[in-house]
């Protein structure tokens, strides 16, 4: 019988428990007064109340965030916009900066107008002491193309450097510094267009400014980087240092003892010393910023000097020993293994020099180089340089590995005189999309005049090396061209400044923005080799899904 009860208990455990409850009920009732809830019941009620209170609090927070607190307005980005200026001329300058702080890059440019203004500005040439026409700097919204501000800054052609940080406590975080003719140095608040400071320069009437304006370390301790201005007068290059915070001269003009040309750069050696490098024919001229400042100011400088470079520099000619084949056209600081190296571009070769001892790492021979090369990434996180070799029908576009000089990609692509420089934009896969101008016609094409329909913009991505995508066809003169990431990761755009360039007669000047993704979806696919595996639409779809990233 006992075994039978145990078996029944195993089969029906709940029934066994129910039978035991009445037996124990009396004992429990005797120990606890009637009407008093059990401790477990009170705890259960507390837990239930806490659950509903927390649920109510969560719902309240969701309600407040969703319906009461307004979401920040995100400006609607137009795929295409255009702004026109009649009877104007344009200058080769485009810059991108978030002017109105809407987290979208805006566009700054220069133009010279025969009228006092386009009608969007409350300032005329006469308001700033200039005769009509004069040079304006303008900022337009990258989202819509609406004019944010414009202001006259110079009588004639100007050199501009934007993104100059201002001293702490200044009303403006950054400024565009404009050097115009006649010589005047003006800083314009990039947020409002208001003049922060204006200083006359000490340039002679026959002096010519060698662009660009070079940023040097803060020598006057005002919290803003200073500017080195190089001018050429009577076959001599003179240098003056101006405060980036006030425009006042930090050091008066002094001869660098060289007769260089434009295209100078500021190079920092492995020892942290700053040297100005200037193309001087087939040679490379240089002066240390420390030596230039201390010579004219007769004060000590916090800057460093590099004994190795001082030994390499000729005391008489200020020339560095560089064996260049042909006249030097361009100098570029490029990323190296232990600091910046130097890419030297002459009329006959590209040469990568070690950034410290200037020994050649590699040389790539060319026939004729007219444009500055463009840096990018052909392989993931591996720097490459896009170069243009030759001109006209003999032009060739190449991508070289920056570390070795090896050819990664090449394509014959005839060009036209006055084609804009190439551009690149990093993509999310740690490569770059490359943009360049040219004319690609099939071998069976009946077109007798290359480029008769206009200049054509092509796009190349390294994941599709056998395909070019023709994005645009422009028939008007192009003064400046840039590919800009207006919004991180999502909105890349081509910016074109077209019209007559100074000193041509005035005409219609236009600034146009095209969204890259829209151009890709409507682009013409050019197969460089037979037997492409993907259809034209598949190529367009694949390239339209590219995500872009900002420069590191």
UniProtKB/Swiss-Prot annotation:
Recorded topology in the membrane: Single-pass type II membrane protein
Descriptive protein name: Protein FAM234A
Cellular location(s): Membrane
A Pfam family the protein falls into: Beta-prop_FAM234A_B
Sequence similarity: Belongs to the FAM234 family.
PANTHER family, A to Z: PROTEIN FAM234A, PTHR21419
Organism superkingdom: Eukaryota
Transmembrane segments: 49-69
Transmembrane found in the keyword field: yes
This protein's UniProt keywords: Glycoprotein, Membrane, Signal-anchor, Transmembrane, Transmembrane helix
Keyword Metal-binding part of the UniProt annotation: no
Intervals, Cytoplasmic compartment: 1-48
Membrane topology (Extracellular): 70-552
Any one cellular-component term (Gene Ontology): cell surface
Disulphide bridges: none
Carbohydrate attachment residues: 115, 238, 473
Xref: Gene3D superfamilies: YVTN repeat-like/Quinoprotein amine dehydrogenase
């Amino acid at each position: 019988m006992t075994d039978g009860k145990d078996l029944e208990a195993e089969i029906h455990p709940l029934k066994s428990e129910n039978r035991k409850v009445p037996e124990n009920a009396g004992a429990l009732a005797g120990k606890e007064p009637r009407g008093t809830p059990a401790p477990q019941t009170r705890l259960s009620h507390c837990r239930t109340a806490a659950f509903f209170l927390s649920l109510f609090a969560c719902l309240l927070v969701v309600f407040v965030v969703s319906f009461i607190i307004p979401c920040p307005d995100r400006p609607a980005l137009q795929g295409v916009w255009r702004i026109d200026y009649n009877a104007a001329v344009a200058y080769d300058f485009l810059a991108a900066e978030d002017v109105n702080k809407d987290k979208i890059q805006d566009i700054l440019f220069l133009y010279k107008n025969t009228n006092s203004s386009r009608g969007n500005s409350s300032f005329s040439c006469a308001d700033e002491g200039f005769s009509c026409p004069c040079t304006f700097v303008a900022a337009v919204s990258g989202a819509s193309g609406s004019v944010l501000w414009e202001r006259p800054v110079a009588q004639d052609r100007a050199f501009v450097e934007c993104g100059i940080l201002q001293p702490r406590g200044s009303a403006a975080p950054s400024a565009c510094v404009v050097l115009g003719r006649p010589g005047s140095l003006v800083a314009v608040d990039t947020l409002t267009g208001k003049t922060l400071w204006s200083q006359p320069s000490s340039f002679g009437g026959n002096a010519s400014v060698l662009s660009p304006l070079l940023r040097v370390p803060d020598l006057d301790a005002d919290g803003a980087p200073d500017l080195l201005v190089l001018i050429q007068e009577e076959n001599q290059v003179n240098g003056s240092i101006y405060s980036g915070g006030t425009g006042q001269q930090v050091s008066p003009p002094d001869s660098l003892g060289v007769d260089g040309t434009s295209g100078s750069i500021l190079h920092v050696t492995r020892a942290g010393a700053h040297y100005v490098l200037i193309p001087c024919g087939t040679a490379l001229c240089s002066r240390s910023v420390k030596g230039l400042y201390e010579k004219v100011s007769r004060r000590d400088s916090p800057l460093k000097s590099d004994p190795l470079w001082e030994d390499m520099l000729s005391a008489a000619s200020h020339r560095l020993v560089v064996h260049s084949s042909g006249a030097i056209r361009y100098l570029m600081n490029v990323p190296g293994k232990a600091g910046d190296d130097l890419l030297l571009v002459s009329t006959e070769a590209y040469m990568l020099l070690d950034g410290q001892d200037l020994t050649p790492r590699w040389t790539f021979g060319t026939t004729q180089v007219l444009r500055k090369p463009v840096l990018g990434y052909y392989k993931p996180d591996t720097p490459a340089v896009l170069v243009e070799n030759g001109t006209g029908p003999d032009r060739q576009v190449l991508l070289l590995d920056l570390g070795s000089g090896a050819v990664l990609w090449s394509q014959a692509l005839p060009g036209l005189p006055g084609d804009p420089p190439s551009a690149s934009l990093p993509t999310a896969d740690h490569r770059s999309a490359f943009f360049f101008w040219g004319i690609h016609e099939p071998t069976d094409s009946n077109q007798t005049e290359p480029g008769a329909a206009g200049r054509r913009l092509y796009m190349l991505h390294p994941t599709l090396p056998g395909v070019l995508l023709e994005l645009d066809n422009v028939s008007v003169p192009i003064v400046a061209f840039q590919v800009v990431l207006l919004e991180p990761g999502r909105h890349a755009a081509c910016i074109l400044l077209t019209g007559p360039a100074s000193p041509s007669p005035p005409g219609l000047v236009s600034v146009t923005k095209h969204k890259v993704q829209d151009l890709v979806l409507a682009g013409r696919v050019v197969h460089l080799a037979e037997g492409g595996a993907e259809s034209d639409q598949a190529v367009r779809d694949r390239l339209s899904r590219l995500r872009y990233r900002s420069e590191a």
